[in-house]
């Protein structure tokens, strides 16, 4: 049985939707910047002031794709927020695995939310007619090498966590009634963008389950993620939805900018 999802929070001018999935009026391009894997530490101060000051000149929205800190410690988040407060545009974000290391991901999420970042974990937001959905995602492998729920209880528990994360992402996409949407993740939904990492660890870098979820929806314009520091900058789902790895180490191979900007 399918239940209707609550409408997403709208930021800025609300998009008029006379029928599900269609916007009224002229189509306006939204400039979406994205970056992940800043890995701010306890001794990192002022390292990203330029990023947050500059991004508002080139983009309308900033997506933060997780691993913003090294261990999810409160002093690390405070150092991040000291720079992040300089950002002049709306921000949407997800946590990464590093934010879970100290066992207080809820506190990290709260601190970021209090600083104005719209945190995605099964939620959805709409900014000037473009939807934003997603979550951290999970690992488990890709294609025929994806781990299946078979054998030991511990393996089944692991796979169930991946399934639940994919379901949360699907719920957030389902909330949106925009014809254009951006999905934010930390883990990769496709193998394309993790190539370059040792093949032995590909299963720990993402899961095809997320791509399968994304491909069920026609209104997803692009996907951004982080996590794979030595991966490739671009890939696509089976249906051709563009997927971009915006981990900062990957962005550094493309040029000087500490973020990437997309027209949506």
Language-model segments: which ranges?
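N-terminal active-site segment of His-dependent metallophosphoesterases
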Residues: 1-90, 100-103, 155, 159, ...
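Binuclear metal-dependent phosphoesterase catalytic core
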Residues: 2-29, 126, 208-221, 229-264
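Active-site-proximal beta-strand elements of phosphoester/diester hydrolases
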Residues: 29-39, 129-141, 182-184, 242-248
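Active-site neighborhood of phospho(di)ester-bond hydrolases with catalytic His/Asp-centered motifs
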Residues: 34-36, 62-67, 91-97, 118-123, ...
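Metal-dependent catalytic neighborhoods of phosphoester/phosphodiester hydrolases
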Residues: 43-48, 68-85, 95, 100-115, ...
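Active-site-proximal segments of metal-dependent phosphoesterases and phosphodiesterases across multiple
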Residues: 80, 147-149, 176-219
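Hydrophobic alpha-helical segments and helix pairs
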Residues: 102, 108-140
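Binuclear metal-dependent hydrolase catalytic cores centered on His/Asp/Glu-rich metal-binding motifs
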Residues: 115, 130-178, 203-208
């Amino acid at each position: 049985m399918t239940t209707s999802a609550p409408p997403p929070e709208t930021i800025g001018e609300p998009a008029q939707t006379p029928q599900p999935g269609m916007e009224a009026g002229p189509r306006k391009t939204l400039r979406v910047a994205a970056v992940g894997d800043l890995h701010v530490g306890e001794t990192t101060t002022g390292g990203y002031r330029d990023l947050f000051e500059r991004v508002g000149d080139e983009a309308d929205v900033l997506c933060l794709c997780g691993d913003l800190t090294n261990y999810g410690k409160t002093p690390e988040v405070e150092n991040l927020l000291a720079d992040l407060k300089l950002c002049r545009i709306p921000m949407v974000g997800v946590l990464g695995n590093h934010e879970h290391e100290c066992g207080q991901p809820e506190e990290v999420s709260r601190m970021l939310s209090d600083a104005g970042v719209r945190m995605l974990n099964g939620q959805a937001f709409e900014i000037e007619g473009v939807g934003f959905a997603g979550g951290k995602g999970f690992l488990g492998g890709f294609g025929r090498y994806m781990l299946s729920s078979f054998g030991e209880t511990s393996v089944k528990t692991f796979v169930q966590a991946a399934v639940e994360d994919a379901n949360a992402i699907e719920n957030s996409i389902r909330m949106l009634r925009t014809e254009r949407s951006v999905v934010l993740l930390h883990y990769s939904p496709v193998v394309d963008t993790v190539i370059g990492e040792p093949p032995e660890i590909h299963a720990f870098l993402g899961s095809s389950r997320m791509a399968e979820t994304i491909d069920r929806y026609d209104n997803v314009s692009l996907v951004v993620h982080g996590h794979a520091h030595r991966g490739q900058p671009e890939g696509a789902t089976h249906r051709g939805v563009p997927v971009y790895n915006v981990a900062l180490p990957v962005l550094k191979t493309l040029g000087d900018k500490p973020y990437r900007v997309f027209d949506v």
